[in-house]
């Protein structure tokens, strides 16, 4: 009996000790969470930079969006050996889950919008200390501009997209927008107009550094494009008047050499409202790996290799032949071909059309050096996307 009492007492004491223990809550400092993040101005800026980082994805401005916007326009065409891509630009949709024409752009535009929403959900938190109120307002305006930028292209590509202004959560339910694409586009554009008008009030007129961040002119330019999509011509005109005749006149003007707008060496010039900054030090920019992201590709681009002439790259999208013919319909006052054609396109007859430019090289070679077939000699490649002129 005594032995039983001793054993029972031992278990009772152990149970009491275990029951009174406090749970030790250890945070993993090597992994970020919402509980640890969004506490400082640096956190907000890091979140903002994550939105900018979405420029450098295949589905956005590193590669595929050019195929979509140019290839599906009247002046673009694809003769790519990749059948799905070729047919996509001709509105032949045999695979709605085609990664290059649909999935990557949809996914990565939404990722950018969700990241912007995260910044906007936290930036008004009074517990976060900023260098100044102007700093906070500028950062908020940047987030609104970025969200509007991505939404603009979402609507112009898909028309019928849901308007999501908060960070996504697991409890979110799909939006039912079937049968009302035009009305939904108006809803989205109206919200973007409101956001950009607010951003205009708080973005700086110009930036002495950080040229990759938007200014008032960037916001006015994007707002004008949205107004035009919305067929609000008078409001669009007001935006352009601010740029050309108003306060923006001190920043923006026409280039003395208009061809500078077609040259990668004269970027961010006086005609530029906003430019995405790419690095030629890592110009391939192949971000889609088995692990999804390649940290070494975050400032590069696949623009040139995607649209370069046959034999140099993938030539996934190029110009329609009628562009050349249309340019040549009207001569300059001295009887020459329109010089804009020379800076826009590269084609077999360019040397004859522009004898004032006898050594027309692209990536170190003349057209004849590529020894194209008779059929390929009728093709027209987009010269302005190269980094060789």
Give residue ranges: language-model regions:
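Active-site beta-strand/loop architecture of penicillin-binding DD-peptidases
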Residues: 42, 361-389
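Alpha-solenoid helical repeat scaffolds
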Residues: 153, 157-160, 164-166, 202, ...
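Acidic donor-binding segment of Leloir-type glycosyltransferases
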Residues: 193
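C-terminal motif of bacterial Sec signal peptides marking the signal peptidase cleavage site
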Residues: 18-20
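Bacterial N-terminal signal peptides that target proteins for export
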Residues: 1-9
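An aromatic- and glycine-enriched ligand-binding surface/loop that stacks and positions planar moieties
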Residues: 22-84, 161, 197-198, 213-368
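Conserved, well-structured interaction surfaces
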Residues: 45-59, 81-158, 179-187, 196-208, ...
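Short coil/linker segments at helix-helix boundaries
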Residues: 160-182
